[in-house]
């Protein structure tokens, strides 16, 4: 298939359409505004629905309603906009409504800036809204990977009835890369495969099949039972849906852990260090929830590994999960920046050399 040069945000939007999304609800905010801009033109072309909501809060509740019918629905925002969506995201998780949410992360906290960041890891992975819930959370490192993950996102969301979150950063959204676009999925809502969906109820129909979707359980025992069902589902996701990349890890002297675009910078640093005779590997979680604890532990606790370096475009958020995985078996150091200053290849090389010298 031919390659097409596309901006990341537009490629993500097109991939969602090709995966069967026919409803987009959102609100403009930099650096993801190209997603709703693209959808505003593309959705009408394929008979879909684009609606610019009056706010992020309204947009996520529109997602809740439309996804409750069994349709494939998507919304996107950036950081503080996703913060505004958290109540509705918790509703979707609590009601087990599958949907796709894109967070093109920007600098923070507060208004921050409009440059790239990975500062929303805690929000995405640990649960930004209220209650005990998780989102299946992807952290793509390239435009092509974002496309490929989008093509499986709805299938995973519907299999488990779980919202899917993309933790992308402003670099992926704004960069242009050659990509291979998949064929269009012929998706139609099948009530037999989605008996939970609200597909309409008329007088005379069986009341038991009218389909009520909600996340409120006034009776304490009912809420406890529902939460037990959620936790059982999350265990299935943890068991079956972990994704990661191991790069040059066998017999490595040092292991770098990183996610998203930072991992690409880390690979450049690994190449430079190899020229200096230092063997460095990389473990890159592709799903940050569920986090691939076993894979990280296996790579980082090899006898050859002297220490682990976690590199992020924040002040050390995934670092906590890396430390949990390693559990004190190896020293773990951190290098990162806030303020949207991407760690450079030279900085990562210098940090590894410093660790080698025991500094």
Give residue spans per PLM region.
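Conserved thiamine diphosphate
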Residues: 115-170
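Short beta-strand segments
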Residues: 100-105, 138-140, 165-169, 312, ...
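Conformationally flexible catalytic loops at phosphate/diphosphate-handling active centers
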Residues: 161-246
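Generic long, charged, amphipathic alpha-helical segments
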Residues: 266-299
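Peripheral docking tails and interdomain loops at the edges
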Residues: 312-359
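Thiamine diphosphate
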Residues: 1-127, 134, 142, 338, ...
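Glycine-/acidic-rich phosphate or pyrophosphate-binding loops and their flanking alpha/beta elements
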Residues: 7-11, 232-254, 267
């Amino acid at each position: 298939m031919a390659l097409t040069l596309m901006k990341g945000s537009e490629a993500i939007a097109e991939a969602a359409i090709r995966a069967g999304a026919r409803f987009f609800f959102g609100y403009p905010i930099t650096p993801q505004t190209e997603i709703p801009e693209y959808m505003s033109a593309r959705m009408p072309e394929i008979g879909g629905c684009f609606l610019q909501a009056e706010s992020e809060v309204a947009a996520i509740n529109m997602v809740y309603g439309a996804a409750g019918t069994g349709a494939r629905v998507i919304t996107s925002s950036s950081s503080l906009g996703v913060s505004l969506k958290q109540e509705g995201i918790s509703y979707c998780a609590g009601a087990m409504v599958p949907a796709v949410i894109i967070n093109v992360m920007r600098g923070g906290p507060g208004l921050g800036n409009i440059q790239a960041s990975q500062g929303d890891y805690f929000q995405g992975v640990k649960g930004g809204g209220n209650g005990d819930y998780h989102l299946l959370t992807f952290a793509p490192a390239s435009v092509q990977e974002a496309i490929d993950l989008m093509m499986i996102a709805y299938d995973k969301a519907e299999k488990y009835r779980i919202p899917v979150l993309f933790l992308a950063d402003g670099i992926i959204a704004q960069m242009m890369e050659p990509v291979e676009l998949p064929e269009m999925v012929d998706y139609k809502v099948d009530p037999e495969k989605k008996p939970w969906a609200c597909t309409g109820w008329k007088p005379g129909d069986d009341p038991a099949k009218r389909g009520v979707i909600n996340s409120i359980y006034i009776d304490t025992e009912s809420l406890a039972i529902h939460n037990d069902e959620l936790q059982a589902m999350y265990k299935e996701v943890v068991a079956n849906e972990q994704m990661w990349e191991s790069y040059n890890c066998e017999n490595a002297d040092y292991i770098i852990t990183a996610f998203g675009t930072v991992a690409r910078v880390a690979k450049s640093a690994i190449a430079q260090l190899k020229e200096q005779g230092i063997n460095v590997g990389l473990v890159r979680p592709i799903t940050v929830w569920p986090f691939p604890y076993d894979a990280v532990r296996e790579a980082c606790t090899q006898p050859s590994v002297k220490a682990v370096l976690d590199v992020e475009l924040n002040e050390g958020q995934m670092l906590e999960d890396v430390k949990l995985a390693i559990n004190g078996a190896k020293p773990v150091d951190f290098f990162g920046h806030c303020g949207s200053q991407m760690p450079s290849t030279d900085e990562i090389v210098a940090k590894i050399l410093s660790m080698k010298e025991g500094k």
